[in-house]
């Protein structure tokens, strides 16, 4: 059977908070089967837990933030959540001594490296998948996102930026998920933003950790980063990375195909909520025979070494 996964050991990294600009320490701890993904703020006394849950996502303005009923939040979880999805981690406790996860280089790659450093341990409990049974679609003006039945996990994503630095041929990506392909083709794509927006936010005491080290930065005509892009379609690839993380806010891998046009964190979250609210749209399933596993969730082998 396909088994649940956790980490072999405790790992830690430090980075800078995107919004505060301050040093943040992140600690990942192994967890028992059926624990799920739990974010924990240890800077509060007592510590506050935020289980991965689409209903906890209450702010998607500048990042994905989990907010509890008392208004306590933990921000910028999306890239770490994408790395957890990419590595198939079902059970982990994520401790952070600040109100936000460190931004690192603006991609999921540092978190993938951290997970690989910890090592992956398979537990003797079946992994529970969310299998999509019928199409569900959410629209917002000309933006839309829908998820459909599919034996695997596929993302078909289109963006539409009218900008000289973003070629029209590089605004669509179809990605068939597997751990190897996520690490190789998706995890290194960085978030992006416009210099005018960053300057405005910093004038409002926000985005104080924003810099060329953690994002692709554009003005009205060009990319301002000296090293340019990591690959030609990095913009749409990062949107796919975001969607992988957003859909994993259920805490479970999905068997289905996401199709999206100009979607972002908010629409992705609305779609996930709509799916889970419709009992006829999905079902729990396990994969007892690994030979019958979709390629997306076959044993990653050397990735886990």
Swiss-Prot record:
Taxonomically, the superkingdom here is Bacteria
Looking at the Swiss-Prot or TrEMBL record, what is one Pfam family this protein matches? LpxC
Reply yes or no: does the keyword Metal-binding apply: yes
Q: Which InterPro entries match?
A: Ribosomal_Su5_D2-typ_SF, UDP-acyl_GlcNac_deAcase, UDP-acyl_GlcNac_deAcase_C, UDP-acyl_N-AcGlcN_deAcase_N
Record's Gene Ontology CC terms?
A: membrane
Q: Which residues participate directly in catalysis?
A: 265
Decide whether keyword Transcription is in the record: no
Biological process GO terms, please? Answer: lipid A biosynthetic process
Metabolic or biological pathway: Glycolipid biosynthesis; lipid IV(A) biosynthesis; lipid IV(A) from (3R)-3-hydroxytetradecanoyl-[acyl-carrier-protein] and UDP-N-acetyl-alpha-D-glucosamine: step 2/6
The coiled-coil segments of this chain are: none
| Required co-factors | Zn(2+)
Family statement? Belongs to the LpxC family.
The role this protein plays is: Catalyzes the hydrolysis of UDP-3-O-myristoyl-N-acetylglucosamine to form UDP-3-O-myristoylglucosamine and acetate, the committed step in lipid A biosynthesis.
Report the protein name in the record: UDP-3-O-acyl-N-acetylglucosamine deacetylase
**Natural source organism:** Aliivibrio fischeri (strain ATCC 700601 / ES114)
Q: Lineage of the native species?
A: Bacteria, Pseudomonadati, Pseudomonadota, Gammaproteobacteria, Vibrionales
